[in-house]
Amino acid sequence: MRIDVLTLFPEMFSIFNHSIIGRAIGKEILKINTVNIRDYTIDKHKKVDDYPYGGGAGMVMAAQPIVDSIKTVKKENKGKVIFLGPKGKTFNQNLAKELAKEEELIFLCGHYEGIDERAYEYIDMEISLGDFVLTGGEMACIPIVDSICRLVDGVLKSSESYEDESFYNGLLEYPQYTRPPIYEGKAVPDVLLSGHHENIKKWRKAKSLMITKKVRPDLLKKYRLTEEDKKILKDFNKKL
């Protein structure tokens, strides 16, 4: 997968040189480029923003450097142009799965009070990280790109690494334990030490259901429960 990020702060994306994403870049499974929007402004002072027409607080990113940077990147990257903004569709795991199927993507990070409306003509999709305010699109872009990239084939060692994670299958993840078997008087559940894979699988599914029911009941409304799932939840409710 190739991703180009249009931003005023390319240095912020150096985080992708590390850990899982960094290794995938090293293996050429991923290619993540940053493009400095400021390099495309025709303003002699390298300005990329200006005061909004009609008045108001803050500054607005000008259309010209945004559009010119998109046009240049589009010569090599034919992917969708995704703007990180508050009016967009809220990002979730299902959208991450959908975008992970793409071979190329372009992300546009806004800043200041937003972007000139005329730049939207070159944008295919707008995504929001949530109902809160961030300093700039970079803050939203980093976790979104990370979430997408880890689903690309070959980035993780196996699909099992993400298929059991919270949200992937619609449930929160089960509790995890590692050595030592007893810490501060608290022991690892016996089932996890039993070596009985089927029982471990059932225990993990039960715990996922119980945790989701307790912490995020809204997720269960969207989840297709089996008869066994319903029995687990019924038993769990009796214990409350």
UniProtKB/Swiss-Prot annotation:
The gene is trmD. The keyword Transcription does not apply. Pfam families: tRNA_m1G_MT. Belongs to the RNA methyltransferase TrmD family. It is found in: Cytoplasm. GO terms for cellular component: cytosol. S-adenosyl-L-methionine binds at residues 110, 129-134. It comes from Clostridium botulinum (strain 657 / Type Ba4). Homodimer. It is an enzyme of class 2 (transferase). GO terms for biological process: tRNA N1-guanine methylation. Its EC number is 2.1.1.228. One of its GO terms (molecular function) is tRNA (guanine(37)-N1)-methyltransferase activity. This is tRNA (guanine-N(1)-)-methyltransferase. Keywords: Cytoplasm, Methyltransferase, S-adenosyl-L-methionine, Transferase, tRNA processing. CDD domains: TrmD-like (cd18080).
